[in-house]
Amino acid sequence: MKGEASQVMITLTVDVEEGFHGLWPSARRTMIRYMHELPEGTFVRPLRSILKLFEEEHVRSTFFVLGKIAEAFPEVVEEIHDLGHEVASHGYSHVDLTKISLTELEEMERKNYDRLTKITGEVPRGFRAPFFGINPSIISLLSKIGYVYDSSVVPSLGIPGWWSYHSASLRAHCVSVGEGEFFEVPISVFPYLRLPIGGWFLRNFGVTYVKTAIKWFLSRGIPTIIYVHPFDVDLNAQKLGGTHFYATRRCGKYTLKAMKNLLETFDCQKVPIRDMLEKIMV
């Protein structure tokens, strides 16, 4: 590891998916029930709001793109890449990868790896599993395919519907996968409470909660990894009926302003994960 001063960094990552993909089951069922009323590609407008914010704040970040999104909207993936952001994989389909055979998973993920490479002209380096579901066998497979890091581990307390690893390291670290070198880049959590600080937690717990966690990480020289989704800044999300209020609470302007607040509050590097790894790993 290099000196702590070089590790004062924030990466505000974006999981590029449709709104119904990442919600808790009750909200997801409602979204799917009304999908025939929703135009395909409802993620595009809020995604472009995020891209615009990043341009205004001179921020480059990592976008984990779902394979089905890349398949249907290659021009959107190309747009992300052309703006200087890192394009990484969010898996081909938004399902729990731990419930799929490794043979089927390899076929799916090689397909997405090749597709992202074709669209961007660069091989994707990073991966984030849907629902943060990862295990050593999947890590080995990702390394075999060609990925060099994963950012799926959430070192948090157990949360229903999620994979949680409460005893995992808070720092990016190298993991053993045979002859290759592979890195795990854990998603940042609130200290002591061990709860996530992105997405739903940013919206429901508020920006001060997230800023407190970031200060804790940066004061210890630990790069901070936060995640959001286009859904989190979608102005239409709160119009969806049939879900608990907290599923869509503060989607839209609040979250976009909160992201702007976070980016402007901290005078440190805001970089893609690939760049962060190059800076902190010897």
Regions flagged by a language model, labelled:
Residues 1-126, 131-186, 190, 207-282:
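Catalytic alpha-helical scaffold of carbohydrate-active enzymes acting on polysaccharides/glycoconjugates
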Residues 124, 194-204:
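Surface-exposed cleft-lining segments at the edges of enzyme active sites
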